[in-house]
Amino acid sequence: MKEKLREPIGELVTGRDPDEVTVKLKKLIEEINPPIVVAVGDYVSSKLHEHNVNVDIYIVDGKIERIEKSIDLICIKNVYEAVNEAGTISPSAAEKLHELIHSPEMWPAVLKIDGEEDLLGLAAILSAPDDTIVVYGQPKRGAVLVRVNEDVREKMIKILQEG
């Protein structure tokens, strides 16, 4: 499964540096005008926040490429916690994420993960309504913008089933 997930699920956004990537992401998100934007990962979340991109749900674990890092999302008052072990999607984390996605009164929100958040992008794609944007980092390459629809969900289910 990890090999399949190393390839971008959506549109790979690249640039000379992280700021250029973030500016491109911001433009794409504004053009699409999605009902929900979910950012997965500390670095992507911090860059989108720094560039004032309207993100509804940030999913973070306090680490960037497995190294403890503190990011500044202090202005987000709605912070929720869940446990998710590395390489898994725990039922409790998936349920909390599902609740956040379907509760706009809780936005903007940070879902702080004790463990690892990487695979929760899959849970976001499976839970989110059509046209939701899920953004996650693609280390050393840029960021990936996924526009959720039934085809993307089916692809994720197939990857999970094949394990």
What is the meaning of each model-derived region?
Residues V55-G62, D130-Q138:
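Short hydrophobic/aromatic-enriched beta-strand-loop microsegments
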Residues V144, K155-E162:
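Helix-rich interaction surfaces within compact, conserved domain-sized segments
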Residues A109-Y136:
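Hydrophobic/aromatic-rich, well-ordered segments within soluble, folded domains that form packed cores
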Residues V38-S46, D114-G121, K140-R141:
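Gly/Ser/Thr-rich loops at beta-strand to alpha-helix junctions
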Residues H49-I57, L73-I74, I125-D130, N149-R153, ...:
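Short, solvent-exposed amphipathic alpha-helical segments in soluble enzyme
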Residues V79-L119:
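Internal catalytic-core helix/loop-beta-alpha segment
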Residues M1-Y80, N84-E85:
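N-terminal, charge-rich interaction modules
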Residues Q138-V152:
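Short, flexible loop segments at boundaries between secondary-structure elements
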